[in-house]
Amino acid sequence: MIWANLIHLGFNMWEEHDAKPLYGMESRIKKILNIRRAQPYLRFDEELWNEILAHMKKAGMNMVVVDIGEGLQYESHPEIAVKGSWTTKKLKKELKKVRSMGIEPIPKLNFSTMHDTWLGPYSRCVSTDTYYNVCRDLIDEVCCLFEKPRFFHLGMDEETANHQCFSLYAVVRQHHLWWHDFYFLVDEVERHNVRAWVWSDYLWYHPDIFFKKMPKTVVQSNWYYGKIFNKNINYVKAYLDLENHGYDQIPTGNSRSGKENFIRTVSYCTSHISQKRLLGFLQTIWLPTTKPFRKKHLEAIKIVSKGIRYFHREINE
């Protein structure tokens, strides 16, 4: 059973560095944007990274999903890096350390247009020959660096105009183009004998199309961060629909929305998804890996440890 933690190496996954919206900026949004805006330097504390890994090991977690973004000096495209980005040599050293702790490292590059600011100039070249070549190069390089990982998370969530309402530049692929680019990315991953993994957002809005066109080979991470779980909630119903259609799942929770969410995700999905198709669970925090957020990172791991204990009690009863 997978017990995974999503950790950001890069964090330029939302609005541009100079995004200063002219409207809709109430105080809560200002606070969020102050964290999310892209920066020309790496927001990553190595001491905290090591502490997180140690706590994960102690908690019984066995997978870390590394959201790489601009956090790496890609040899194929060094222009994507920012000040402080890891060298490929540094990344390989860290991956070796992670594996020695009994934790499986999995790469994530989010190619959703909502979350691709990390691509730098290429985020404004979507669906062009240049874009496809860059995506291919990055997937090839990352698969090699991670030594043919079991999974490769491609993101692909929240690609809507509404989600990009505070960005300076918004682009949305729709209909056949979204699927064309999605299949392209999946094919590039599978070319390395690696299994693609994505967020399941598309299902919420277009279930009929999703089940007609989504390959069963692609691992699904539906995500729901609420406290109430019942099938009348569309985001919760997605877990049931994915199960009924035979997809492998790694349900995803979040610690910032409340301590109850992850445990309830484990409880609900353990009861409603076949053990054959329930690959594990993923915890998220959606904050930089930096000292100001240390407490929240460690609290997220503590919550997973409770989820692990709950799961084993349920299975053994």
Regions found by a protein language model. Name each.
Residues 1-3:
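Extreme N-terminal starter segment of soluble prokaryotic enzymes
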Residues 314-317:
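Catalytic domains of carbohydrate-active enzymes that cleave complex glycans
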